[in-house]
Amino acid sequence: MGTRSSPEEGTPPPLVPECDVEVQPQGHPEESREQEASEVLAEPSSRGGAEQQAEEEEVGEGSSTESSRDAPEATPPIAMAATPPASTSSREGVRGAARRLQGQQLEALTRVALMEQRVKELQRQRKELRIEMEVEVALLRGELAGERVAARREEEQLRELLEQQAASEQRGRQQREQEQRRLSQERDRLEGLRQRLRKAQGQLDSQPEDQRERLLQGVQEMREQLDVAQRAYEDLEFQQLERESRQEEEDRDSPGPQVPDPKVQELQASMAQHRRGALQHRIRVLEEQLKSLGEQMAAESRGLSRKKEEALQALSQERSRLLELNCLQGTPGGDFSEPNPALTKLLFTQKTDRQLLVLQDAVAHSAATPTSSCLFSVHSSLQGSIGLQRTGSLPRKRGERGSQRGSPRPLSFHCTESLEASALPPAVGDSGRYPLYQLLNCGRGNSCGAIHPDIAHMERLLQQAMAERERLLKAREGTRRGTEGSSGPAVPAITAPPTPPHPPGPRILDLRQHLEGWGHNPENCPHVQVSGCCCRGPLVKMGGRIKTWRKRWFCFDRQARRLAYYADKEETKLKGVIYFQAIEEVYYDHLRCAFKSPNPRLTFCVKTYERLFYMVAPSPEAMRIWMDVIVTAADENHAP
């Protein structure tokens, strides 16, 4: 990385603007060690020459452990000249202290990760407990409401039964009283006629002969009236007896007597009272269970909240200790002398659902120049990729190829100023590819909030920044060589690794000839339109949130490096885009995982960082063509 300055030289190398932080994929921690050269150049002159030599030797050791992907670009370190024993012992002491600090940092990182996992587990348990308790409470409340409704129904039936009984008794009593009054009236009338007849017969003997005939006629009329009244009384009495007998017969024959037997009615009332008491007892039991369940839920919630608070306090303490260790090992600004991707993730990024918040150390805010935090949004497909690069293999043709990503996934940066060369972190030894994640350096005058959704524009800016960075590295190398030549170098120079080339574009490939070479015949497949760089055709796709199957028109474009799908064949209503960089796997749905697939035998899957797409082809040949087309695009993008 250029010549090394001797410890005796007091002139620091020229400063070059660089990014504050760089987050590298966790799967390749060796790549971050190559940035030591540029970080050493940016350090203040207060650091001694022995520390610079120690860090440069650590850079050499990090470069010798590069992965197989970066092996062609990494240059083996050249043996350094012999140094005095004092410098050697000082360098070994610094190296040992750095190792101890790094070990403590890794231990603290492990504890922090475990505590974060504990906090998440407590949150999950609390959520599950709340859901379970809510379900139990809802069930108990529903059962209690049902029991109360049944109790009210029983009470209403009992009240109606008692009212019917009272009304029936009242009607029977009134009817009997009315019949008794009629019988009494007829009996009194009959008795009056009898008394008149006896009185007339008594007067008949004492009357003279001339009046006796007239009295005999009156007595005869009275006897006739008495006979009529006697017959009427007997008829009325007979009708009453007949009505009573008929009522008794109806009561015996009918299943529901209008006037039930008092014993039966008493039995029914007692049964209703018993059922009512049982329902009330059940209601009391359910109310007690509901109350105890609420108390239990509150107690468990308080316990989980207390455990969560304890875990959060421990997590805060471990993070503070980790920041202190970082300040002991790194610079006052919080940079690491040996960047660790996992530590970088922990200290500088806090992953939310769809955002990465760049955090800054409070010590850096008080000691160094205050800078504003920069926020950039990352699509949810990037979840879990900071510090842990996801790898995948395409089962059809990606067998033994490397799992490194060739180009970055789409990012949406929020910064008002344009991207400068100093705002991008160095990416030496990255084989000419862009870093997977890059944190922008928002200075004091920068403000966050403007959105640049144009991905192609962002890629062009990244290429310009890479070129500017390479130019600055060359200028730095020339300055170092000039300084070494003027001071008479006593040690051999270290040759810089070759400049990484620009990301190569897609190789020239005729898609139609490629498919024909694989044994396909696009001419005989009317459902697919294949040209040299495009492939179009209808597919049935399952929705992401709402699992419904809809027919879409897919357009595979190698020049735009994307697979777009539209609502119409004229390609005017764009519904979604799948970029080549996001494709991980393409495979046949042999497990029949698609939800209610219209044709499971023609269903295949396209796995991306964001989601899993289920698609149904119109024919088997169309399915094979589409799978080979998408696999070819993913192979080109992920080729090592």
UniProtKB/Swiss-Prot annotation:
The keyword Nucleotidyltransferase does not apply. Residues 104-327, 454-481 form a coiled coil. SUPFAM superfamilies: PH domain-like. Keywords: Coiled coil. It comes from the Eukaryota. Residues 1-100, 162-189, 241-262, 387-412, 476-504 are annotated as: Disordered. This is Pleckstrin homology-like domain family B member 3. It comes from Homo sapiens (Human).
